């Protein structure tokens, strides 16, 4: 599922305030999330610089703006308290559920696995 998450105040280029994020794992009190960002918010230079660690997941079912296409920022994966997870919408207009397809989830998980595998095989991990 995709949630509206309050990332709070952060440092530098970390995500902060409210953003959509894909929950890839949940425990009792925390969730492991991959922040999502709109395609239209980024320049071709940003895309080129981050092409090894972003996933173009396209349109996501349930977004209030059906034309919104997204990138999953797998290099910004983080654990957050489940208290930071919020539903999308409001009491007046109603809440809506945003979900990625199985294919989109697989693309994100495959990219995370690829990043981890490449780190290990290139000898970039200290013994």
Each model region followed by its residue ranges:
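Short coil-to-beta transition motif at edge beta-strands of beta-rich domains
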Residues: 1-9
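Short beta-strand or tight-loop elements
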Residues: 3, 17-19, 70
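A mature extracytoplasmic/lumenal domain signature
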Residues: 9, 35-37, 78
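Compact nucleic-acid interaction/catalytic patches
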Residues: 13-61
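C-terminal terminal-subdomain/extension
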Residues: 47-127
């Amino acid at each position: 599922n995709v949630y509206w998450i309050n990332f709070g105040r952060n440092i530098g280029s970390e995500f902060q305030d409210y953003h959509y994020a894909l929950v890839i794992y949940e425990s009792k009190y925390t969730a492991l999330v991959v922040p999502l960002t709109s395609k239209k918010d980024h320049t071709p230079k940003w895309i080129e610089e981050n092409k090894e660690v972003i996933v173009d997941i396209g349109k996501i079912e349930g977004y209030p703006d059906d034309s919104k296409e997204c990138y999953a920022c797998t290099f910004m994966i983080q654990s957050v308290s489940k208290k930071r997870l919020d539903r999308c919408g409001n009491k007046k207009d109603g809440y809506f559920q945003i979900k990625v397809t199985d294919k989109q989830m697989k693309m994100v998980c495959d990219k995370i696995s690829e990043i981890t595998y490449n780190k290990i095989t290139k000898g970039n991990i200290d013994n």
